[in-house]
Amino acid sequence: ILLQGKVILGVSEEYPLKIYQQRPNLTKTVITVGKKENVVEGYDGKNGYAMNYVVNKLQIQKDYVAESFDTDFIDFESKGFSAQVLGKEKVGDKDCFKVELTKNVNKTVYYFDVQNYFLLKEVKKDETLIFSDFKKVNGLVMPFRIEANTPKKEGDYVMILNRIDTNKAFPENTFKF
C-alpha cells in the first residue's frame, strides 16, 4: 500500500508525506523538506530505523517493535487479546460502541460508529488517534485524515491523505535502509 498526502506538525509545519507498506510488516515513511525526500522511519523485516535529528542520520532503533498492518482487534483472540464492550459513548456527534482490548497490562480502547462500524477513535496509554474523512479505495473504506494526540503534546500531528494505492508492488530496494 502507498499512502500519500501531507503531515502537519505543531501549528504551522507542513510536509508532503509518503508511507510505503508491504506485508507482513515492512514500512517506510518519507517526508519532503524543500525538494529533498527524507526517510524518517522504517522497518526492513529485521531492524527498525528512525531519524536522529541531532546527527541528521537514519539510525537503527534497538527497541523498535514491528507492528502488523492489521490492527489488534482483527482476529484479536488469536493474538492473545480479550475484548470487553464498555457500552456506548459519543465521539464528536457520532454514537459509538466503546470496546476495550486487553493483553497482559496493555489496554487499548476503540470507538466504532454504531451506524457503519467505522473505527473513529483509538486510545492507548501514550497516544489517541482520531480517524475521519472516510473514502472507498478499491472496495475498502479508509480514513483520509488521522489526528494523533499525546498526553504531553510533543508528538501531536495531523495526517491528511490525498491518495491511497492498494496492492502496490514496490521495487526490491524500497525497504533497504
Model-assigned labels for residue ranges:
Residues 34-37, 56-58, 116-118, 128:
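Short, surface-exposed beta-strand-loop junctions and turns on beta-sheet-rich folds
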Residues 16-20, 39-45, 57-65, 112, ...:
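Short amphipathic beta-strand/extended segments with alternating polar/hydrophobic composition
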Residues 95-176:
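Gly/Pro-enriched, hydrophobic low-complexity segments
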Residues 10-13, 33-36, 81-82, 92-94, ...:
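Short solvent-exposed loop/turn micro-motifs enriched in small/polar/acidic residues
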Residues 6-7, 86-89, 134:
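Short, solvent-exposed loop/turn elements at beta->coil junctions and helix N-caps
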